């Protein structure tokens, strides 16, 4: 579960390394985000020469959470870290590569480009 002020790792090559959650999008008063939800983030740490600069406010989609998500068959999937992918307005990734596994729940949110670029879909 991701809420305001949560720091996440960035799982793409857009240039950002770490981001801070500003807002969870999707309804008034929504407090937490899970895998597949869109959030507004501020870049706290970035690589030099990247597409995204430090201090920039961008949208991102959550791809991994420590708290995990419950599947319809009753199983849970949890990850070792909280991670996101920075996206454009058309839900496509700003970077050209995705690092690490992503959850299958991203297909339901129409993030097919992220799913196709990911090395592993769990």
Curated annotation (Swiss-Prot):
InterPro entries per UniProt: Ribosomal_uL14, Ribosomal_uL14_bac-type, Ribosomal_uL14_CS, Ribosomal_uL14_sf
Entries under CDD domains matching the protein: Ribosomal_uL14
GO molecular-function term, one example from the UniProt record: structural constituent of ribosome
Keywords: Ribonucleoprotein, Ribosomal protein, RNA-binding, rRNA-binding
PROSITE patterns: RIBOSOMAL_L14
Gene Ontology biological process terms in this record: translation
Assigned protein family: Belongs to the universal ribosomal protein uL14 family.
Role played: Binds to 23S rRNA. Forms part of two intersubunit bridges in the 70S ribosome.
Quaternary organization: Part of the 50S ribosomal subunit. Forms a cluster with proteins L3 and L19. In the 70S ribosome, L14 and L19 interact and together make contacts with the 16S rRNA in bridges B5 and B8.
Protein name: Large ribosomal subunit protein uL14
Record organism: Staphylococcus saprophyticus subsp. saprophyticus (strain ATCC 15305 / DSM 20229 / NCIMB 8711 / NCTC 7292 / S-41)
């Amino acid at each position: 579960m991701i809420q305001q002020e949560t720091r996440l790792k960035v799982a793409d090559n857009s240039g950002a390394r770490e981001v801070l959650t500003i807002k969870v999008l999707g309804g008034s008063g929504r407090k937490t985000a899970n895998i597949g939800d869109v959030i507004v983030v501020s870049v706290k740490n970035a690589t030099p020469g990247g597409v995204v600069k430090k201090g920039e406010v961008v949208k991102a989609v959550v791809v991994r959470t420590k708290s995990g998500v419950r599947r319809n068959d009753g199983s849970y999937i949890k990850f070792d870290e909280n991670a996101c992918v920075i996206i454009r307005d058309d839900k496509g990734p700003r970077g050209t590569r995705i690092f690490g596994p992503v959850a299958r729940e991203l297909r339901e949110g129409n993030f097919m480009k992220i799913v196709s670029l990911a090395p592993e879909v769990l």
